[in-house]
Amino acid sequence: PWILLFDPTSACNLHCKGRWAAEYGNSLNLSFEDMDCIVTECEEPGIHWYMCTGGEPTCRKEDLFKLAAKHQNSVFHLFTNGTLIDQAFCDRVKEVGNMAFFISIEGIGDATDDRRGEGVYDRVMHAMDLMRENGLLFGTSICYTSANYKAVTSDEFMDMLISHGVRFNWYFHYMPIGDGANVDLMLNAEQREYMIHRVREIRGFTGGKPIFCIDFQNDGE
C-alpha cells in the first residue's frame, strides 16, 4: 500500500447530521506513542502518505504537530471541520511543513450550517482565508446528498472555493448511519450518474476549473 488512514481520536467539537463516525462515541484515542509506532513501522516498507480522520483530528493538534515534525519524510493530510484553525495553528503548520488539509463543507451559508451547526460556515470561510494568506495547501471534503449535489458542483460554488484558495475537492456521497438518519438524502441512480459526468467536466482540460475534483465512490475505478 502507498497510503494509510488512521483516526487519532473519535472526539469532535461538532455533532453533524448523518456523521458516520458519531456512532463510535467520542472517547477513543490513539496515544502519541501509538501513532508514532504506526508511522515508524509503515515507513519501513515505503508508506509515506497518511490521512487522519476522526472524530476531529485537530482536537489532537499538538500530538499531530509533534508526529509530523518527527517524520519529515512523510506527509500528513487531515480531514477537518476547520473550526479550530487560527493563526497560531497556521504558524505551526508552516513550521513542520508536511501537513495539508481537507476542510468539510456542504455548500454556501445555510447548506453547511444546517448540517454542522449555526455559524460553522463563517468559521470555515475564516479558516480558508487564514490558510490561503499563510500559503498552506488545503482542499475540501464535501458530503453530497440528493438535496445539494447540484449546488456543490455548480460553477458558482467552484468559483467561490477557488477565490478562497481551495486547490482540490474530495466528494463523498451521503451514507445514512444510525436510527435517526434521513434515507431521503441518499442519491438515486440518475443523480449518481450526474455526479460522474459533472466531476469529470469540472476537472476537464477543456472548459474545466483550476481545481482538482475527486469523487471517492465514483472514481473508485
Regions found by a protein language model. Give the residues of each.
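Canonical Radical SAM [4Fe-4S] cluster-binding loop centered on the CxxxCxxC motif
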Residues: 3-33
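Radical SAM/AdoMet-radical enzyme domain recognition
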Residues: 32-52, 60-173
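Short glycine-enriched, charge-decorated loop/helix-capping segments at active-site entrances
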Residues: 23-28, 114-120, 184-187
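Flexible loop/turn segments at secondary-structure boundaries
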Residues: 8, 59, 177-179
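A short, flexible beta-alpha/helix-coil linker loop
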Residues: 22-26, 108-111, 176-179
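Residue-level recognition of short, structured coil/turn motifs
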Residues: 13, 21, 72-73, 117, ...
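A C-terminal junction/extension of Radical SAM enzymes
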Residues: 174-221
